[in-house]
UniProtKB/Swiss-Prot annotation:
UniProt-recorded name of the protein: Urotensin-2 receptor
Protein's organism: Rattus norvegicus
Record-annotated membrane-spanning stretches: 55-77, 88-113, 125-146, 168-186, 210-232, 259-284, 300-321
Gene Ontology terms: cellular component: early endosome; plasma membrane; recycling endosome
Family per similarity comment: Belongs to the G-protein coupled receptor 1 family.
Length: 386
């Protein structure tokens, strides 16, 4: 869960996903401290106000995000019969966001009551859900970026990929995300500390620090390097294609689909990078020079950012699919006009289609698949983009 019940002492913090408990000096076991009891003090009016505000904000985010993602799923169901890859991936992203948002009521209930009421199974499921959906989302975005890269630079390779192949890729992202989340799911357990119930990991602080560092690499660093490299190469390819396209057709390609995918990726990083830095800071710095009030504010902000990502995403998904449909219609019109003018500067595109027809593939049943993966602009005949 993204929301952490922060410590009000300077003791070393052991972070469980988003829940923070304290490790007392001289005690090898994690034990309850003022992370639970502090905010319940009657004199802590600020804490009560802060709890009410964060509860209201998260509730609003949950409602908006759930409505938006359900709407996205309903709309996408109309296009799933098409062979276009984007619809499969957008459905996967919306499902991940929806699952993540479903944990909001449990977070609010836990923070208001200052206790855990959902048992050992709730610990294992809810405290692993954010890692699961986080990885499923970023892995899907990485695949989407690689698909767009292939559609621009290797169109024939992408045409040969069926919708079933892409569904297997999506299933693979969830299986890999589940594999990375499995250690947390197995290690977390319900522990009684006095009159309170806490979800704590069975392993020690060092193992937990190592595990969180690994997940930071798999959810932020690794995908970031891959996506960054893909977009650097795409930027170079678009720069070259713009030069050639201007000379040949006086038209520049329209990379709006790529821009929107990149926007979703950047939003993911903007929302989850502060969360991860906050978590790792607690792991690698035993005593942070922050007052309890400051730590609480930082925790609230990082929490709202992570859930804000799933709240804003549906609006970007709508823009993405709208521009994607326009792009497909534009490519179909371009193919239709080019087929009547084989000697025109844009005749490279239908020649690719003829290659597929000569190889025995029928494009009549998958014209949308073919137009999706053809290049956004004519390729120079000297192969400069390859």
């Amino acid at each position: 869960m993204a929301l952490s019940l922060e410590s009000t002492t300077s003791f070393h913090m052991l972070t469980v996903s988003g829940s923070t408990v304290t490790e007392l000096p001289g005690d090898s076991n994690v034990s309850l401290n003022s992370s639970w009891s502090g905010p319940t003090d009657p004199s802590s009016l600020k804490d009560l106000v802060a709890t009410g505000v964060i509860g209201a904000v998260l509730s609003a985010m949950g409602v908006v995000g759930m409505v938006g993602n359900v709407y996205t799923l309903v709309v996408m169901c109309r296009f799933l019969r098409a062979s276009a890859s984007m619809y499969v991936y957008v459905v996967n992203l919306a499902l991940a966001d929806l699952l993540y948002l479903l944990s909001i009521p449990f977070i609010i209930a836990t923070y208001v009551t200052k206790d855990w009421h959902f048992g050992d199974v709730g610990c294992r499921v809810l405290f692993s859900l954010d890692f699961l959906t986080m990885h499923a989302s970023i892995f899907t975005l990485t695949i989407m970026s690689s698909e767009r890269y292939a559609a621009v630079l290797r169109p024939l390779d992408t045409v040969q990929r069926s919708k079933g192949y892409r569904k297997l890729l999506v299933l693979g992202t969830w299986l890999l995300a589940l594999l990375l989340t499995l250690p947390m799911m197995l290690a977390i357990q319900l522990v009684r500390r006095g009159s309170k119930s806490l979800c704590l990991p069975a392993w020690g602080p060092r193992a937990h620090r190592t595990y969180l560092t690994l997940l930071f690499g798999t959810s932020i660093v690794g995908p970031g390097l891959v996506i960054g490299l893909l977009y650097v190469r795409l930027a170079r390819a678009y720069w070259l294609s713009q030069q050639a396209s201007f000379k040949q057709t006086r038209r520049l390609p329209n990379p709006r689909v790529l821009y929107l995918i990149l926007g979703i990726v950047l939003l993911f990083w903007a929302c989850f990078l502060p969360f991860w830095l906050w978590q790792l800071l607690a792991q690698y710095h035993e005593a942070m020079p922050l007052t309890p009030e400051t730590a609480r504010i930082v925790n609230y902000l990082t929490t709202c950012l992570t859930y804000g990502n799933s709240c804003i995403n549906p609006f970007l998904y709508t823009l993405l699919t709208k521009n994607y449909r326009e792009y497909l219609r534009g490519r179909q019109r371009s193919l239709g006009s080019s087929c009547h003018s084989p000697g025109s500067p844009g005749s490279f595109l239908p020649s690719r289609v003829h290659l597929q027809q000569d190889s025995g593939r029928s494009l009549s049943s998958s014209s949308q698949q073919a137009t999706e993966t053809l290049m956004l602009s004519p390729v120079p005949r000297n192969g400069a983009l390859l």
